[in-house]
Amino acid sequence: MRREERNMDKLLISFLLSLFMVYFPPSDVVLPSQFEASTDSYVPMSSYPQETQSAKTPSPGSMHPAELIKEYSPLAQSVRQLSVKPLDEPLINRLEKALAVPVKYQSNYLRI
């Protein structure tokens, strides 16, 4: 019974605290209704260069293939760099020769 009272007290305190924070926010919080476009503290929504650039990028359907390749070449380059490439056959053979453990030294070696 005492445990339920503690849980109820915690719930009530957290609810009252959240209501207090909604109606009396800290002084450094500025609500959108308090903004004026003429003040120095106004920051436009797309203030980052990536956002403005992506907003200006035309849709892929309206571009020619050459322009499309030019626009997305950094993306294609990063995909090419990060993709896993298959190893050449001679390199695989060299790795097998260098890293292979002879059969007689393996733990599962069986004598016939």
Curated annotation (Swiss-Prot):
Compositionally biased tracts (Polar residues): 47-60
GO cellular component: plasma membrane
Function in brief: Modulates the activity of the potassium/proton antiporter KhtU. Involved in protection of the cell from methylglyoxal, a toxic by-product of glycolysis.
Bilayer topology: Peripheral membrane protein
Region (Disordered) location: 42-64
Entry keyword set: Cell membrane, Membrane
Protein name: K(+)/H(+) antiporter modulator KhtS
Subcellular compartments: Cell membrane
Induction: Part of the khtSTU operon. Induced by salt stress at alkaline pH.
Superkingdom assignment: Bacteria
